């Protein structure tokens, strides 16, 4: 276990340079945040926020780096017609409910089957507002989240208008889609960030 923790720390230090890191939150403040939200963050993200950085200026996602714990990007509460094909999926100004389970277990492309607002609006709201912390945004309307509650706990998910998908090719291999692998793939230019 100590070797895995040391390897995770080394990779996160190498991937995210000191000059790009915000001050770490510290263990006491992190535990207080977790108590106030009734969740325990998954490792190694938990250790990263407490000991290495509570947000970064560069890194995944590509626009602005990692958000500080609990923060939302500016575009979270702004609806621009060119970024959103679906009806407004959630109240972006409302509080996020982290202790309720993230509702999805596999990719969902609602842009193809959003024919019933009454049927889909509750699930869409939960997808954006329940059980995950926001990691950042690639651009307005595209967000990376880390699931903190429910069966997908520990997995990174990509949310965009019309689709929500887990990071990694195989849902049966959760470690490939966790925070550490997501950062590593960005750092070495593979997976999502592979040059086209």
Where would I find each of the regions flagged by the language model?
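A surface-exposed partner-binding patch
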Residues: 1-137
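Short, glycine-/Ser/Thr-/acidic-enriched flexible segments
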Residues: 140
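Segments surrounding the PLD/"HKD" phosphodiesterase catalytic module and close analogs
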Residues: 143-177
